[in-house]
């Protein structure tokens, strides 16, 4: 019996859609689409303390999620053109996420873990809890770009006030494909927001 699966594979510099066919003994893999990816530098408000005339623009880094979505859809169409598909899997980098409003619509592009705002969030958290306490709860090595610190940094941004849901990048794409907003545990465990013992969101 033949089984055909499609993999959506997104990395920090490129993405691709692959079609795999398993005949019970061997797996044949073929590429259906490939497209570029990378954080986009987005100018923000001007810094009033900058020495240059008019101030220096603060730069944020965001993912062009709609360009990725277009590349994914093209790949899925090509995969379907080549034959029926039994399942779709999604693999992306961790920690980054999209914010959704109360109607389930995306609020702007997802911020990139390469943005300087991550360090601001990390400093605020570590002023309250030390890294050993955090490790005891989430089991993660300290990294300033962990989702926990990004979510704290969100509190200083207006769009976060409109957000009702946050979905990690693969969960966001799965939501767009299926209409179901869910969090997958193994990826959620990279956020720093999951209790490593309880294997659920940490209320603290």
Give residue spans per PLM region:
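N-terminal glycine/serine-rich phosphate-binding loop of ATP-dependent small-molecule kinases
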Residues: 1-109, 136
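Glycine-rich phosphate-binding/catalytic subdomain of phosphoryl-transfer
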Residues: 46-47, 54, 76-204
């Amino acid at each position: 019996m033949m089984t055909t699966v499609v993999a959506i594979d997104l990395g920090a510099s490129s993405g691709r859609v692959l079609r795999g066919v398993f005949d019970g003994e061997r797996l044949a893999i073929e590429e259906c689409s490939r497209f570029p990816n990378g954080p986009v530098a987005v100018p923000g408000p001007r810094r009033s303390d900058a020495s240059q005339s008019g101030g220096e623009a603060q730069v944020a880094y965001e993912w062009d999620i709609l360009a990725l979505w277009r590349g994914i859809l093209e790949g899925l169409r090509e995969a379907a053109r080549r034959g029926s598909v039994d399942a779709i899997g999604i693999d992306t980098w961790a920690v980054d996420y999209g914010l959704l409003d109360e109607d389930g619509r995306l609020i702007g592009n997802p911020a990139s873990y390469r943005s300087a705002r991550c360090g601001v969030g990390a400093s605020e958290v570590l002023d309250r809890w030390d890294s050993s306490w955090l490790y005891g709860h989430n089991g993660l090595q300290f990294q300033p770009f962990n989702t926990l610190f990004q979510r704290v940094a969100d509190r200083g941004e207006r769009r976060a006030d409109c957000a009702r849901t946050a979905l990690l990048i693969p969960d966001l794409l799965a939501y767009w494909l299926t209409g179901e907003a869910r969090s997958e545990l193994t990826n959620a465990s990279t956020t720093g927001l999951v209790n490593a013992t309880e294997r659920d969101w940490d209320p603290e």
